[in-house]
């Protein structure tokens, strides 16, 4: 994961209370950067399950322009590495965003929806679990609900209640698999 994932540990006790979950989020990383460290972080660490949450920093063009298909392909490559090593994969939807305050020229709403559609179809075709954070956290404008799940000065990163909602969605999906 990226900053959203990294900050989960700062805004919640979820990882302390669930020590089988390891947070590997690194601030501002994009899927290509995550892919570079994926084998070491997931396979060599001996994981039996991986939860992939990625894409918003590419949509924000943090490392330059990239197509939605390229973003998805990087996530698919991580999924394939895990599957090839008998690691169960969960792919998460990208959280809603209708503004990227650090790159105001980007209009993310449609791109988030499109990427989520591609990810969901991939999961269905490949028998991979899809964690749909988007549906539970989106507002009328296609953004992350503010002030419920993000601050009005951010609009991209979850607040404490946002992380609580993510935990609820995640644990409900995991319980379905048990």
Language-model features: locations:
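Catalytic His-Asp segment of secreted/periplasmic serine-dependent ester chemistry enzymes
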Residues: 95-178
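Structural recognition of the beta-strand scaffold that forms the well-ordered cores
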Residues: 21-25, 49-53, 89-93, 129-132, ...
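Sec-exported extracytoplasmic/periplasmic mature domains
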Residues: 39, 43, 55, 80-87, ...
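Active-site segments of SGNH/GDSL-like serine hydrolases
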Residues: 53-59, 79-113
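Short C-terminal domain-edge/linker segments immediately following a structured domain
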Residues: 27-33, 51-57, 81-85, 120-123, ...
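Short, functional N-terminal and low-complexity linear motifs
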Residues: 1-6, 44-47, 82, 86-89, ...
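Conserved SGNH/GDSL esterase-like catalytic core that processes O-acyl groups on lipids
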Residues: 1-77
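Alpha-helical scaffolding segments of alpha/beta enzyme cores, especially the outer helices
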Residues: 70-80, 84, 114-121
């Amino acid at each position: 994961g990226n900053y959203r994932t990294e900050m989960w540990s700062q805004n919640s006790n979820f990882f302390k209370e669930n020590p089988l979950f390891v947070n590997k989020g690194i601030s501002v990383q994009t899927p290509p950067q995550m892919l570079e460290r994926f084998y070491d972080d997931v396979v060599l660490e001996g994981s039996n399950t991986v939860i992939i949450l990625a894409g918003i920093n590419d949509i924000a063009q943090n490392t330059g322009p990239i197509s939605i298909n390229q973003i998805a392909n990087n996530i698919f490559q991580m999924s394939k590495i895990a599957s090839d090593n008998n690691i169960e994969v969960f792919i998460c939807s990208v959280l809603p965003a209708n503004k990227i305050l650090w790159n105001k020229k980007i209009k993310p709403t449609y791109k988030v929806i499109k990427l989520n559609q591609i990810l969901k179809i991939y999961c269905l075709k490949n028998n991979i679990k899809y964690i749909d954070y988007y549906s539970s956290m989106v507002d009328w404008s296609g953004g992350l609900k503010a002030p419920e799940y993000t601050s009005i000065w951010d609009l991209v990163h979850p607040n404490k209640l946002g992380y609580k909602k993510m935990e609820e969605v995640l644990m409900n999906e995991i319980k379905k698999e048990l």
